[in-house]
């Protein structure tokens, strides 16, 4: 675990096929991609650690990250439907995508602190 989780995630996510696989797991199975990336970064761990992490992050992931993602996805078809305002709607969607990314980055920061604390227990 030498690289930060964020750096590790960017490198792994950029590999061929990883992004599409992660997004498929997210869309089809409801997988939290950050949890998946954490598991790859962290390596072997006890079930209790993963359960504790999911319990800690569940409200943030469901309420904030997924909430922003849902809003971003809802706006996408509206860009065409609101053609007279399509540029403004597209800009708003882009801002929400940026907030979603920041929320994921914060989630990963929490995960890194969690891993550091768990490793010392």
Task: Kindly label every feature range from the protein language model.
Residues 8, 21, 37, 53, ...:
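A general alpha-helix detector
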Residues 19, 61, 65-68, 72, ...:
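A structural signal for well-ordered alpha-helices, especially hydrophobic packing surfaces
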Residues 77-121:
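A charged, amphipathic interaction segment
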Residues 5-27, 91:
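Short amphipathic alpha-helical segments and their helix-coil junctions
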Residues 1-15, 66-73:
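An acidic intrinsically disordered interaction segment
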Residues 57-85:
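Helix-adjacent hinge/juxtasegments
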Residues 20-58:
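N-terminal interaction modules that seed assembly of large macromolecular complexes
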Residues 42, 72-75, 115:
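Hydrophobic residues within well-ordered, non-membrane alpha-helices that form the packing/core
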């Amino acid at each position: 675990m030498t690289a930060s989780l964020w750096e590790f995630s960017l490198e792994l996510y950029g590999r061929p096929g990883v992004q599409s696989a992660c997004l498929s797991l997210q869309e089809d199975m409801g997988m939290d991609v950050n949890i998946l990336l954490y598991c790859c970064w962290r390596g072997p761990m006890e079930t209790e650690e993963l359960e504790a992490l999911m319990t800690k992050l569940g409200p943030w992931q469901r309420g904030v990250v997924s909430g922003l993602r849902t809003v971003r996805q809802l706006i996408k078809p509206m860009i065409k439907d609101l053609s007279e305002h399509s540029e403004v709607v597209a800009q708003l969607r882009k801002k929400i995508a940026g907030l979603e990314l920041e929320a994921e980055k914060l989630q990963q920061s929490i995960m890194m602190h969690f891993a550091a604390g768990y490793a010392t227990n």
